[in-house]
Design a protein with these regions (language model features):
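Stable alpha-helical structural segments in soluble proteins, enriched in small hydrophobic residues
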Residues: 62, 150-157
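RNase H catalytic domain
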Residues: 16-24, 28, 68-149, 186
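Conserved "HGTGT" condensation-loop signature of ketosynthase/thiolase-family condensing enzymes
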Residues: 33, 125, 170, 174-175
């Protein structure tokens, strides 16, 4: 990421996990993601990982934290990027594509009552605000390598209650062959997105 320039396209694959989600008691959770950046001259893909955890949480809360952590990390570079954010969480994708604009128009209120995880939604909007983002949903546990890897990072973080402490050099390239030797049926790796096909979501809010 150190070579990424303003306007470059960044691909983020994020996932979340919560052990015992919805049950009574403290349910530990984690979130993780794979961040990819394509060097425009060499076509080399640079990959970084991040992961976080909470001792008592929910799936939706960790999905929001996966967004916040990813965008805070790339924003530390001081550049505004075009970002393709891929998640299997409809809560995130539909929220960012549809719900947030109406909530903000109503003063962060919704017709049906209180907004779940309101403060995290506000943090997510702030973290995202300087970037152009396309929010893309992908079916979970469907063999898409980058998404499966994000799931691996999230579930490991939840189980170990570990945190990456920022971006780490990715282990994706060594993880993929290990899965192919096991029982996981991985599909072909998603190619780095084409800038010409990038379609950012309409940003109907300000911060």
């Amino acid at each position: 990421m150190t070579r990424a320039q303003s306007g470059d396209l960044v691909a983020i694959y994020a996932d979340e996990s919560c052990i015992g989600n919805g049950r009574e008691g403290d349910n530990p959770g984690g979130a993780g993601g794979l961040i990819e950046w394509l060097h425009p001259k060499s076509s080399e893909v640079t990959r970084c990982d991040y992961w976080i955890s909470e001792p008592a949480t929910t799936n939706n809360r960790m999905a929001l934290r996966s967004v916040i952590e990813a965008f805070r990390e790339i924003s530390r570079r001081g550049n505004a990027y075009r970002v393709l954010f891929t998640s299997d969480s409809k809560y995130i994708v539909e929220g960012m594509n549809s719900w947030v604009a109406s909530w903000i128009a109503r003063g962060w209120k919704r017709k049906g009552g209180a907004i779940e995880n309101l403060e995290l939604w506000k943090q997510a909007v702030t973290a995202v605000s300087q970037h152009e983002v396309q929010w893309r949903w992908v079916r979970g546990h469907n063999g898409q390598p980058q998404n499966e890897y994000a799931n691996f990072l999230a579930t490991r973080a939840a189980a170990e209650q570990s945190n990456s402490g920022g971006l780490r050099e990715s282990e994706f390239d060594s993880w993929v062959p290990e899965q192919k030797e096991g029982t996981v049926d991985l599909k072909n790796m998603a190619p780095f997105p084409d800038l010409q096909s990038f379609q950012p979501s309409k940003r109907a809010w300000t911060t």
